[in-house]
Amino acid sequence: MPYLTRQKFPVPLDRDQVAQDWRRRGYSCDAFTDPPGREWNNFVHTTNELVAVKGGRLKLTIDGEEIIAEPGDEVFIPKGVFHSVRNVSSSTTHWLYGYD
């Protein structure tokens, strides 16, 4: 399964629409707001994770592969895989995440 699905959701991204889609697929849906340069490094989870960018840009490193995610994109992070997330936007980035 590829990590990145470009333009999975229409922009502007609607959190309720994403939450409904993810619930149907067995995922939760929560939100993060990160300032420019914020990093979350070397995480690994026992569940699969989905990420969707609402506004801004994120650089995700998943098992050594770098991905730039933009508004409307969805990223799949498999369970048991090391990953990092960084706000590479010059402004605040708003993003959604969920676990199965």
For each feature predicted by the language model, list its residue ranges.
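Short histidine-centered beta-strand/loop micro-motifs
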Residues: 19-21, 39-45, 86-88
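Short strand-coil-strand connectors
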Residues: 25, 61-65
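A short, N-terminal "cap"/entry segment at the start of jelly-roll beta-barrel domains
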Residues: 1-33, 41
